[in-house]
Amino acid sequence: MTRLEKIFKQTSAKKKILVTYTVAGDPSLKTSKKILDDLVSSGADILEIGVPFSDPMSEGPVIQKAHERALKKNIEFKDILNICKQIRKKNSSVPIVLMGYMNSFLSLKNKLAKELFLAGVDGVIVVDLPYDESKSFFENLRQEDIDLIRLISPTTDSKRLKQMLASSSGYLYYVSLKGITGAELKNFDEVKKKVKKIKSLTHLPVVVGFGIKDAKTAKKMASFSDGIVAVSYTHLRAHE
């Protein structure tokens, strides 16, 4: 059983999974490592680590600035893998998921899956993964038991959803609104309806992210999903 499978096995009506999102290297690699350690100590169930990218198209102003600050520190993919290795040495159970854009993952070419495995990474989320490359990308990752976590949006139709599920593992990330991160979420009923539909088609857990700005929203989203994604407070504070 993988680390992700183990953590989601603990899910119940009263216990939902907290996924925390932190951009690696903002404000520095050393601070990122401390933030991630603190998040685990504070109860984070899954660490989602953002890979800095020059054009993070799905992100709102707060996370875009976090990417910019990290890139100014000349953060490279190998640096992020080193952070993962350090976390894994200290904690053997917390799942680590890298979230980024295709070009970042392609930097390791055919060594990607092996390097992720050696760093103790459990899964990846590729925001701009081309559909025609998803099957081979998924199969390569699975050779090292790395999960490919797919982003499902409000505009994903039934046909496309079923196709995506064929190359998905670990869990599914439902993007609760159209647009960029940080926008305000208003239509809870629509999100609930979509999550329910997704869960009827797969055994994979579904977490909800985007638009979750406070405890009230998080609680509401968790009531019909397996967990929620929360952005590290550090990025929000740095943007003020």
Q: How should each PLM-predicted stretch be described?
A:
Residues 48-75, 178-183:
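Glycine-rich, proline-tolerant flexible connector loops at the mouths of alpha/beta enzymes
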Residues 122-133, 148-155:
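Catalytic beta/alpha-barrel core
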Residues 234-240:
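Conserved small/polar residues in nucleotide/adenosyl-binding loops
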Residues 32-37, 159-162, 212-225:
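Catalytic cores of alpha/beta
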Residues 63, 73, 161-200:
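Glycine/Thr-rich beta-alpha phosphate-binding loop at enzyme active sites
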